């Protein structure tokens, strides 16, 4: 089986609540997670909720990296979806968990676009 991409769904617990509620820090961590994996950043959008929490996306040429935080619970939901073989989504997940000072992370990898035969994707 051949997959177009790998999608990591990460549950990150025991995080520093001050980091989880800081828009600038979360945005920086997410952008840096793309940089350390060698991904090409296309767009960045983040939002701070009232009274707490941050959500955001880093759109990368290889797909996306997203986060939704619950500071009151010390929890972050993170998705990292990468296409191709050049960027390892696990590197981004592990970097994010480390920077959030997480006590625990559980994650599942889903293969996306699974074909029985190899497919050729045109890159523009």
UniProtKB/Swiss-Prot annotation:
PTM note: Is synthesized initially as an inactive proenzyme. Formation of the active enzyme involves a self-maturation process in which the active site pyruvoyl group is generated from an internal serine residue via an autocatalytic post-translational modification. Two non-identical subunits are generated from the proenzyme in this reaction, and the pyruvate is formed at the N-terminus of the alpha chain, which is derived from the carboxyl end of the proenzyme.
Superkingdom of the source species: Bacteria
Cleavage (non-hydrolytic), annotated site positions: 62-63
InterPro entries, sorted: AdoMetDC_C, AdoMetDC_fam_prok, AdoMetDC_N, S-AdoMet_deCO2ase_core, S-AdoMet_deCOase_pro-enz
Cofactor(s) needed by this chain: pyruvate
Gene Ontology biological process terms, A to Z: spermidine biosynthetic process
Coiled coil feature spans: none
Annotated keywords: Autocatalytic cleavage, Decarboxylase, Lyase, Polyamine biosynthesis, Pyruvate, S-adenosyl-L-methionine, Schiff base, Spermidine biosynthesis, Zymogen
E.C. number(s) listed in UniProt: 4.1.1.50
Pathway as given in its UniProt record: Amine and polyamine biosynthesis; S-adenosylmethioninamine biosynthesis; S-adenosylmethioninamine from S-adenosyl-L-methionine: step 1/1
Active site: residue positions: 63 (schiff-base intermediate with substrate), 68 (proton acceptor), 83 (proton donor)
Modified residues (Pyruvic acid (Ser)): 63
Cofactor binding mode and count: Binds 1 pyruvoyl group covalently per subunit.
Broad class of enzyme this protein falls into: lyase
Cellular component aspect of the GO annotation: cytosol
HAMAP family, per database record: AdoMetDC_1 (MF_00464)
Family, per entry: Belongs to the prokaryotic AdoMetDC family. Type 1 subfamily.
Subunit details: Heterotetramer of two alpha and two beta chains arranged as a dimer of alpha/beta heterodimers.
Protein name: S-adenosylmethionine decarboxylase proenzyme
Organism: Thermoanaerobacter pseudethanolicus (strain ATCC 33223 / 39E)
Taxonomic classification: Bacteria, Bacillati, Bacillota, Clostridia, Thermoanaerobacterales
